[in-house]
Amino acid sequence: MKVQLTGISLLLLVGTGYFTFDVISPVLLIGAGIGGFILAIVTIFKKEWAPITVPLYAILEGTLLGGISYMYNSSYNGIVTNAILLTLGVLVSLLIAYRSGYIKATENFKLGIFAATGGIAIVYFINFIMGFFGSGLGVMSINNASPLSIGFSVVVVIIASLNLVLDFDFIEEGAEKGAPKYMEWYAAFGLMVTLVWLYLEILRLLAKLNSRD
């Protein structure tokens, strides 16, 4: 699979985020979030539409990330730059480790990451439901700088990082099997989703660490 499509997707994501960094419009952010979610669902169930849905998703997700990043940076100056650098560092390091054969996506590895990711998703879902009742899990709060809360974020960052290995494996497997063109866009979508998740989790972790000051 061609890496150019991944590059295009990330360029749209980052570029849109950059230009909407200081555009604080609740309507725009909510619209981008809902639109991005819908496009993500469509992409998952209609992979052949990926050449159209993925670039649009990147633009909407970039808009949402721009607003989120601005809010974090307003509270903790410089946190966004640090989060971006750390995300890139993790991406490059794991890519080198994967290409060098130090990390391999074995079946047991995949099963473990799938299970861990599913567990994290359940925790987030529980916290989401609790939010409707004016409550929430303490470890999820960015203002909670307790060892347990920080430890939870570290674990989530590690799991999010290891999901990149699954993306690398998917891209490599698709290239070896001569996957159709639209699957190149779908692979780019998967990698982009993981990177966005990793970036947001690093932001949360850095916010918790900064809240101790």
Task: Outline where the language-model segments fall.
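A hydrophobic alpha-helical transmembrane-helix feature that marks the membrane cores
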Residues: 1-213
